Amino acid sequence: MSEVEYRCFVGGLAWATNDEDLQRTFSQFGDVIDSKIINDRESGRSRGFGFVTFKDEKAMRDAIEEMNGKELDGRVITVNEAQSRGSGGGGGGRGGSGGGYRSGGGGGYSGGGGGGYSGGGGGGYERRSGGYGSGGGGGGRGYGGGGRREGGGYGGGDGGSYGGGGGGW
């Protein structure tokens, strides 16, 4: 798909928030082409994040500016630019820095910055400051994070998750 998509990643959503709620909330910034909450394949329950696709870039930028860190359905949400699925490492998608699965920057599962499971910075299980078995301040990005035995993961050096030097179990 060569066409540019103006899509936002939205993380930290309440379980009760649905596609229509996203559409309604974000349509104040411009024409919403699509809004989708990602559900767990097995349980069918919301995974706490989704995507909103806008018709134009200005609407997307305005939504990111206005909604990131704001409250929706009683939860503070993370909103940032989602990268196209094909872009790979540099800019986002899986394993990149923008949004979406395993993002480095903003939210989602294994997110480095925003919430999400195994998040390095803010929120989620095994985060740096709080969560299951975390060291409360040192490296630690969940299992084996931060370059094994050097600040995270099993037996980590300073403040990682399980068995980290600065705390943990």
Swiss-Prot record:
Pfam assignment, any one: RRM_1
Gene: RBG8
Assembly with partners or alone: Interacts with TRN1. Binds to small phloem-mobile single-stranded RNAs (ss-sRNA, e.g. small interfering RNA (siRNA) and microRNA (miRNA)) in the phloeme exudate, including viral-derived sRNA (vsiRNA).
One example GO MF annotation: single-stranded RNA binding
Biased composition (Gly residues): 86-99
Protein name per UniProt: Glycine-rich RNA-binding protein 8
GO biological process terms, semicolon-separated: alternative mRNA splicing, via spliceosome; extracellular transport; innate immune response; miRNA transport; regulation of defense response to virus; response to cold; response to zinc ion; RNA transport
Induction note: Up-regulated by cold stress. Circadian regulation. Induced by hydrogen peroxide (at the protein level).
Superkingdom of origin organism: Eukaryota
Taxonomy of the source species: Eukaryota, Viridiplantae, Streptophyta, Embryophyta, Tracheophyta
GO-annotated cellular components: cytosol; extracellular space; Golgi apparatus; nucleolus; peroxisome; plant-type cell wall; plasma membrane; plasmodesma
Chain intervals for the UniProt region annotation (Disordered): 80-99, 130-169
Keyword vocabulary terms for this entry: ADP-ribosylation, Cytoplasm, mRNA processing, mRNA splicing, Nucleus, Phosphoprotein, RNA-binding, Secreted
Chain segments carrying region Glycine-rich (GR) required for cell-to-cell movement: 86-168
